[in-house]
Amino acid sequence: MKKIVILGGGYGGVLTAKKLAKKFKNNKEVEIKLIDRNPYHTLLTELHEVAANRAPEDSIKIDLKKIFAGLKVDVVLDEISNIDFKGKKLQSEKATYAYDYLVIGTGSKPTFFGIPGAEENTLSFWSYDDAVALKRQTRDMFTLAAKEKNAAVRRSMLTFVVVGAGFTGVELIGEMAEYREDLCKEFYIDPSEVRLIVADMAPKILPILPDKLIQKAESYLRKMNVEIVTNAKITEVGKGSVALGEKNVVDTHTVVWTAGVEGSEIVGTLDVQQQGRKRIVTNEHLESVDHKNVYVVGDNIFFIPEGETRPVPQMVENAEQAAPVIAANITADINGTPKKAYKPGFHGTMVSIGSRYGVANVGLPGKFFMLTGFMAMLSKHFINMFYLSQVVGFNKVWTYMMHEFFHVENRKSFVGGYFSKRSPNFWLVPLRMLLGGMWVYEGVDKLKKIWEDPDKIFLIPAAPNATDAASAASQAVDAVKETVDAQSAASAVTTAKEAVEALPVPGFIYDTTNWFMDLMFYNPDGTYTFLAKWFQLGMVCAEIVFGIMLIVGLFSAIASIATIGMAVMIWSTKMASTEMLWYVAAAIACIGGSGSVFGLDYYVLPWLKKHWKKIPLVRRWYLYTD
């Protein structure tokens, strides 16, 4: 039995475990174990949204048991204190874990560069708990400031300093600038009293980006009334102040530290070669240069690719690209096949500044292009959803879309509040029942005609090569009359041609429809095939069934979408009048939960959702919503 242990449930650890589980899903001789001290995976790149109350607290946590449901990965909650490389064991206070192959992905922690008071008097910003603590600290300061009579104390309470103007610091200060507006309204504080500062020892913010994007970011931050302090010689952080230089001491109750990271605490204690703030040196296969059965993933990697002068960056894409290489190389070790070399090709960086603006430098290696505003935010959201699709599939992508686009408050989205305006579903009840009633009426009326003459085809137009033109025209008129209200159709058109052309159809769609009907419904002599009769009966029954579903509010979303599909089918044959537009518009309005009020969906969907999530295949493929 080969034992693979992955230490750390961060980006790299989770993706490596999933890749290994896929490779060894049918191999009973391989055991995969992931160890982390938390029961959840944290989306570190979204911490700023929780800290500034834009996203729910649980939106950046993903249950590890959910991620690995149905997969060959044993999740263990424990905190490892030592690794015995010679004995191939991981040790904690309560257990010992043996391994044949080890993947170290314990991530990073803040580094304070020996600055006096920095560690003791600042809020770190590198975990879920940090984000929640900062949100509470910010609210507490506004709560106290609203009651404070001393102007100097009030001013210090309403001064917030973020040390570090890299990606994390800039994204955080941008979110806090938007959060300021909300809190000022809530606590009746003039926004001009609130001071936001982002400071860095470097000569410019976001130094990894091109100067043009840096200027755009600075301009937007200043527009948000954020003070930018560069070349800040941070010498000390006191209990109520921070020194941003010899003559620039800022009184504040809140200093957030985002100025840099180093390897996690356990990495610093390991007997392995390290460089660059406690990063483990690896070879091209991402193995520790000291231990060939030990691999390194994510922020812990120190590896300089061929032709480069700098080590791979500590960013999510590095973890994403390293994970499949490590999984492939462990597989190669076990199977005795050649290993893969790590050849990363990064696709750029994206920075959001608040919920509505961002800058990005993205593309392919050697061919990058700059984005700002809407397009930069679109690219960032796309990359986030792509990552989530790898980790928890549809489930988390759906949740992400809800809190980023559809359930936002105060228009905090790059698409504004256009997709998040909500109204009570009970206003849709009359429309839903009317729409259902119309479809039932149409279906029952047509069913009577089928009952009278089962062989008469009136829902499918006559073949173009039918010999009796007059009969064809008559059938076309009958078809239109059966599709829409007969009296309205008669008053709206005078000939079959006019009726059929009531709603125009693009030529390529009409030609495709004709090709399909020639294949399925017409004989060479222009008469109908036996399928035509059954298709007609099926359409009529569908109109009745979906109409009833709408009336009683059962699976109203499915019924609404189905009626839209039927309307499109009718339209594609040039047999739909303008009345069909009403059917489609009403169905679109009824998709969004119209059956949850005075409908069976109110009872059925919660029960179905509860039992649906219990199906192993559903959980394995994340085909459910929370």
PLM features: what roles do these ranges have?
Residues 1-3, 73-161, 256:
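FAD-binding core/adjacent interface of flavoenzyme oxidoreductases
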Residues 403-541, 558-559, 571-579, 591-626:
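Alpha-helical membrane-anchoring segments
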Residues 559-570, 583-587:
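Central hydrophobic cores of alpha-helical transmembrane segments
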